[in-house]
Amino acid sequence: MFLRTVRSQAVRAAALHHTVAPALCMRPVLRTQTVAFSSTPVTLGKKKKGGKEPKAAAKAAAEEAVDEDLFMIEWNKFEDLSAKSVAAFAAKAKEIKAGNNSPDLINNIEVKISKDEVYQIKDIASVALKGGRTLSISVYDPSHTKQVTASILASDLNMNPQPQANSPQILNIPLPPPSAESRAEQQKELKALYNAFKADKKLTSGLAAIRDAFKKDHKKMADQKSIGKDVVKREDKKFEELQKAWTSKIEKEFKTVSDEIAKK
């Protein structure tokens, strides 16, 4: 509309050329406006082939970021559960390494204090392994020392607690050194535990069960049509890397404890 008006003005100016003084009809304003406006359509407006409009590209990037955040939530859960699994394996592996030297062997022995009072040793005393060859029991109430001693002797553990000379309420139990047979049995038990945590899907606290559950969830998310293929490909690779990392960690724990048993 503006171009049409300018053009009309230019036409009228040309018509007045013969009747108006030369100085007035030579003013450049109308000609400049006409040229500047008419050049605008030539310089604007061609979109590159195969390109995306800025708004469309921004929307696609935002959607991709949301998809990646969804996967990130899943991976955080996976790492948390995997860390707990490796910690559980490490704790059980240490129990196997301790063998008959473990304080847990006597912690649950029941002690009858009186007719109506029965406690477990862990409730009335602290038990610790000292020097690798001695279990030390510190009874909280000195009057309970005799009952604790009697309960340990009555158990089937073949242990003989001895009161410490300068502190009668502290009982020491000397432990025999491990034999080649006991070491071999510990190694066998440790290997079975390691295989269960690594590959047994029935062990819910193991890496295999956790990995299997997340594989199913991952597939459900990847199958959603709303999630882009590029995102799925990247997340597939990341999941593989996480699995390898945690498998490597539990393997490292296994080797560490296995070496410690061999050197006992």
Swiss-Prot record:
Q: Where in the cell is it found?
A: Mitochondrion
Q: What GO molecular function terms would the record report?
A: ribosomal large subunit binding
Q: Name one GO biological process term.
A: translation
Q: GO CC terms for this protein?
A: mitochondrion
SUPFAM superfamilies assigned to the protein according to its UniProt record, in alphabetical order: Ribosome recycling factor, RRF (SSF55194)
What's the superkingdom here? Eukaryota
Record's keyword terms, sorted: Mitochondrion, Protein biosynthesis, Transit peptide
As for what it does, the entry says:
Necessary for protein synthesis in mitochondria. Functions as a ribosome recycling factor in mitochondria.
PANTHER family, from UniProt? MITOCHONDRIAL RIBOSOME RECYCLING FACTOR PSEUDO 1, RIBOSOME RECYCLING FACTOR
Q: Which family does it belong to?
A: Belongs to the RRF family.
Q: What is this protein called?
A: Ribosome-recycling factor, mitochondrial
Q: Which organism is it from?
A: Yarrowia lipolytica (strain CLIB 122 / E 150) (Yeast)
